[in-house]
Amino acid sequence: HHRAQQDREPGDRAPDRALTVGITGAPGAGKSTLNATLCAELLARGRSVAVLAIDPSSPFSGGAILGDRVRMGDVAGADGLYIRSMATRGHLGGLTGATNDAIAVLGATGRDLVIVETVGVGQVETDIVDSADTTVVVVNPGWGDAIQANKAGLMEIADIFVVNKADRDGARDTVTDLESMLNLSGGHDDGPAQWRPPVVSTVGTTGEGVAELADALEAHVAHQHATGELDRRRSAQRSQRLREVAVARVGRALDDLLATGWGGALRAEVEEAHTDPWAAASRLIERLAQQLTDD
């Protein structure tokens, strides 16, 4: 069936897909500048990097990956670096679906590393954890920010914390806050092979602390390989992806069915209270099942 063919992602099956690093945090945390400096550091270490800047607040444009980022500044033209940005709002598979599709494509270009950065003004994205091998959470100095991180559920997903703009007042306090929160929560991987998220201080604009961040990334990758955590994480992501793809496909078929004459008539019955939504839904599902079987 041609549609099933279309939905297939060859990159997803490749066991040696590129390592994926997700960078998230509140808007205004300086993620883009930090990411640019981090890319420069990784390139200097001989890594090849693809950057995917995701804007969950912009409407998805039907698969078009938008042009190169201007915000990357000096590194944008560097060899070994590939930059794309993408809008994801309204993508059938949601943020994760759109991201995973793009990671599969970028991974196929043979890069060592894909860095996924969430941009845009939406709320803090925690979905990134469904696509990343390593999740980096960036916060700004200021006591409130660490508390916000806790509220937004970032404590659970962070593999590495970065206090960016560390030359500002309150940076040291923020580091201390995060450290004590981590002491309480004890990290997020259970078992003897536990990883404790390090807290790295950086100044994205000058590159201060960025080498430490790159070291932390490498340490986390090594830890995941040594403990088998990487395989566990990816298995869980694949299983999650199975459900997402199925839900997206069924949702699409449902919309198609509702757009037919039969679907319109059924909707009209519900709108005019001739049929209750539950009975109508049962008929809809029966018809859909029939149609999916015929396909």
What would you call each of these model-derived segments?
Residues 39-43, 100, 104-107, 129, ...:
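Signal for well-folded cores of large energy- and translation-related assemblies
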Residues 1-21, 26-29, 35-146:
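Nucleotide-state-sensitive switch-loop elements of NTP-binding domains
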Residues 70-71, 146-151, 187-191:
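Short beta-strand/turn micro-motifs at beta-sheet edges
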Residues 160, 166-224:
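Canonical P-loop GTPase G-domain recognition
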Residues 201, 212-292:
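Long, well-ordered amphipathic alpha-helical subdomains in the mid-to-C-terminal portions
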Residues 118-163, 168-177, 181:
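Conserved P-loop NTPase nucleotide-binding/switch module
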Residues 55, 117, 164, 178, ...:
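Residue-level signal for inorganic ion chemistry
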Residues 6, 293-295:
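Actinobacteria-biased recognition of intrinsically disordered, low-complexity terminal regions
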